[in-house]
Structures are given as structure tokens and as C-alpha cells.
Regions:
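Short amphipathic alpha-helical recognition elements used for nucleic-acid or partner binding
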Residues: 33-49
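Conserved alpha-helical substructure of the radical SAM core
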Residues: 76-191, 196-199
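Short cysteine clusters
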Residues: 102, 106-109, 332, 346, ...
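Flexible mid-to-C-terminal extensions adjoining Fe-S/redox cofactors in radical SAM and related proteins
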Residues: 6-10, 355-439
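Radical SAM enzyme [4Fe-4S]-AdoMet core and its adjacent flexible, acidic
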Residues: 206, 210-335, 341-345
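N-terminal [4Fe-4S]-dependent radical SAM core
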Residues: 5-33, 55-95
Length: 439
């Protein structure tokens, strides 16, 4: 490496540890730890400019990991360009709602269940859209959403087979996942979905059976916990494929926090020793239309999430959530230029949390697409210099233009320094710079 002038990256997060430093760069997703040489590294990263000498192994390593960058590099302009283009992958992404009806009535749900099952005409239009546009992409990523998508299994099967055929014929990769409440996810239905190349599953279990029963119940008020857990256990015991993954989401209420140990025991009893099942813990939030004050009383505070991170690190930080803290890991699908939502009536949208807003409507599949409005949507969410996001060190992770619905930073990123500090306790997550005295 030739000698050159370098400077500290604008996207270094420095965590002070009792035995040294942890540094995480949000552009590269690299973490390093330094121990004996912590003061040396701290001084380098606090300098305005540094001479990068090939013989200085510490400087070379910091440069390789992105903690130091070329002196003339404009990192903010690079990120702005990426955000303007909205290109966060090589795949066309379709979020499809085969029905907007649901067999559950969750207390915090933002959906209104006003539309039914997707018609054959809309299905035909979706297949035609894939046929006409897939050539410019490496493949197709389909996410089945709802309502409850398994209430329209025939639509999923019919559409999947046709889209798979298009991708096979055009030599494109086909991936699929599904967000489901898990009630209809019997072993028989799971086998059907697996044959349709659906490999990623998100299922929600809201804690202890009694708490889950108060938050996630059937349309007729009946309980759902046991059915969901039995379905998951049967899949775990009978399906050995390593290509499937289950994200077990838990929406924590304030009440659930004091029962977390009991909940962990339930998870361990039923789903332990299987890396295909990963936890995703969030605090209950308001994504719209919640008017019942008793439901709002369930909401936790940022400090509650931080408590979960501190006390249950191994549950909160896993192979799935680590991806959220990597470059582009938290980019909302609605900010991706090549991602669209198609609801059961064929309306083209960007966000699944705002299905009835004209702001979130861009035409009808197979009939018209308002490209100008879509471009305005993308541009409106560009971060300007007056935004608190503009100089944020977390910006390369989410590019988030704080969600127009939530109007705040994601809880995961609000607690990012704590999460990174906990990650720095596991040697699998970092490289060591300099020397470390063996104790």
C-alpha cells in the first residue's frame, strides 16, 4: 500500500469498554476491538487527518475495515446518491396480499379488513408484470402478506406456480417468504408452501399464553396460542430441511416484561436446539388506527427495550437481528425503488401499514402506474441537511428518513450503542487490532 493521507470515517461508532475500545463502522459493517493499543487507536480516530503508512499495521487495518477512508472521499455524497437511486438490491420485490381478510383480531392491528380475496384478473396482471419486467433483475423476491395470507392458500398456490414458471423460463432466481399468524400453518399446509419455494416464515407469539390470548385472538374471540405452538412444534419435528427459517416475533407489552423468564422457558421447551427458529423482540407500537386507550397502555418505553437487550442479549442478538445492524440492514421496503405492494384489489402501493391512504396509492396493476407520483414519493423521503438523520452515524444502516407513519427512529437503532456494546462481548462479531495481553 502506498503512503497516502486518510481521515476517520464519519460513520464510526466508538464504544468505550472496561478493557479497551470497540469500533463499529456502519458503512462496512465491520467491528474491531482494541485492548493494549486502545489509546493509540483512539488518538488516530480523533485526528483530522492521518498519514497512512504501509508499515503501520494498526492504520492499515483501520483502513481495510473502513474506519479510515481516503482524505478526498465524500461519504455523505455517496450515501445521498444511493438514497436518490433507491437501489438496495438486485431483485424485483413484490409484497402480495392474496386477501385482506383475517381470522384474527389483534388488539394493536392497523388493518381494516375492507377487501377480500384477490381475483383471477388481478393475478393475471401480476404474472404479466413479472413477465414484462423481470429481465432487468437478477431475480424475484415475493413476500406474502395480508390480512392473513393463509386464508387464501389457493391464490398463493396458483400465483406462485405461475411466477416460478416465468422465473425458470427466464433463468431468474425465485425467493419467497410469508408473514402469517401461524394458526393455519399445519404440517400439511406448510408442506404445500414449502413446495412453492416459500422458505422464510414470520410468526408472532406475544409471550405467555394468557397474555397472547388477550392480544391475539380469533375473530370469534377464541384463544390461539396452543394451536400456533403445536403447528410450529410439528414442523420442527417433522421437517428437517435446513433451507427454511422461522422468525418468531414477539410484541412485548409492559405486562410481558416481568414474565420474560417464563416466556424463555416456553420457547426453550418447544423450539430450542434448532437454529432455524430465531427470536425478534419488539415493543408494541402504534402503526395507525389505535383509538382504544387501554391498548395504548400496553406500549412500553425505549428504556424497556434497552432492558431486554441488557438482560436477554442472546435472545435479542442473533443471526437475524445482526443483519439489521449491517449496511442497509434496516432499509424499509417502502424506500426501495424496486419494491411494490399489490393489495388484494390490485392497487399498487409502497407501504403495508397505510393501505387506505391516497398518498400511498400509485395506480392499479395491469392498468396504470403513476411513475411521476412514485418518483415524488422517493424524492420526498430524501434526507435534507436540516434533518436529524442527515449526519447520523446510523444512516448507512437504515437510510430511514424517519418513517412517515412512525415519525421516529426504530427502537432497534435507538438502542444501537447498547446492542453494539453487547455484540462486542462475543469474539465472533469482531476482529482484534493491535495486541491483547493474555490474562
Amino acid at each position: 500500500m502506498e503512503n497516502q493521507r486518510v481521515k476517520p470515517s464519519a460513520y464510526n461508532i466508538i464504544i468505550e469498554k472496561p478493557d479497551g475500545l470497540a469500533i463499529y463502522n456502519t458503512v462496512t459493517g465491520k467491528m474491531i476491538r482494541c485492548f493494549n493499543d486502545a489509546d493509540v487507536v483512539r488518538n488516530i480516530l480523533n485526528a483530522e487527518m492521518v498519514n497512512n503508512y504501509a508499515e503501520n499495521s494498526i492504520i492499515v487495518k483501520l483502513y481495510e475495515c473502513g474506519m479510515l477512508v481516503d482524505a478526498n472521499r465524500d461519504e455523505i455524497r455517496e450515501i445521498e446518491k444511493k438514497e436518490r437511486e433507491g437501489k438496495f438490491g438486485r431483485y424485483m420485490q413484490l409484497i402480495l396480499l392474496p386477501t385482506e381478510q383475517c381470522n384474527f383480531r389483534c388488539v394493536y392491528c392497523y388493518e381494516r379488513f375492507e377487501r377480500g380475496i384477490m381475483s383471477l384478473e388481478i393475478q393475471d396482471a401480476i404474472v404479466n408484470y413479472v413477465e414484462d419486467n423481470i429481465e432487468q433483475f437478477s431475480g424475484l423476491n415475493v413476500i406474502w402478506f395480508g390480512g392473513e395470507p393463509t386464508e387464501a392458500l389457493d391464490v398463493i398456490e396458483r400465483l406462485s406456480l405461475r411466477m416460478i414458471e416465468v422465473c425458470k423460463r427466464k433463468r431468474k432466481v425465485y425467493n419467497a417468504g410469508i408473514t402469517t399468524n401461524g394458526y393455519n400453518l399445519t404440517l400439511e399446509n406448510f408442506k404445500k408452501l414449502k413446495k412453492l419455494h416459500i422458505t422464510e416464515y414470520q410468526v408472532t407469539i406475544d409471550g405467555l399464553p394468557a397474555i397472547h390470548a388477550r392480544q391475539r385472538f380469533l375473530l370469534n374471540g377464541e384463544k390461539t396460542f396452543e394451536v400456533i405452538m403445536d403447528n410450529l412444534k410439528e414442523i420442527k419435528e417433522n421437517i428437517k430441511s435446513s433451507t427454511i427459517t422461522f422468525l418468531i416475533r414477539t410484541n412485548f407489552s409492559k405486562e410481558m416484561l416481568e414474565h420474560t423468564d417464563e416466556f424463555c422457558e416456553i420457547l426453550d421447551k418447544n423450539l430450542s436446539n434448532d437454529k432455524r427458529f430465531q427470536c425478534f423482540w419488539q415493543m408494541i407500537g402504534d402503526y395507525g388506527y389505535i383509538k382504544d386507550e387501554s391498548v395504548k397502555n400496553l406500549f412500553g418505553m425505549p428504556k424497556d427495550y434497552q432492558w431486554l437487550v441488557e438482560k436477554y442479549t442472546s435472545r435479542v442478538i442473533n443471526s437475524y437481528t445482526r443483519g439489521l445492524y449491517g449496511p442497509d440492514g434496516g432499509v424499509c421496503y417502502a424506500l426501495k425503488r424496486d419494491s411494490i405492494v399489490i393489495d388484494s384489489a390490485g392497487s399498487i402501493r409502497k407501504c403495508t401499514c397505510d393501505l387506505d391512504s391516497n398518498v400511498n396509492y400509485f395506480g392499479k396493476i395491469g392498468e396504470n402506474f403513476d411513475a411521476k407520483k412514485h418518483e415524488e414519493w422517493m424524492n420526498k423521503r430524501n434526507i435534507n441537511e436540516n434533518s436529524s438523520c442527515y449526519f447520523c452515524k446510523k444512516r448507512p444502516l437504515c437510510h430511514n428518513r424517519a418513517c412517515y407513519k412512525a415519525k421516529k427512529c426504530l427502537p432497534n437503532y435507538s438502542a444501537l450503542n447498547l446492542i453494539l456494546s453487547q455484540m462486542a462481548e462475543d469474539s465472533e462479531n469482531y476482529e482484534i487490532i493491535g495486541e491483547k495481553t493474555n490474562e
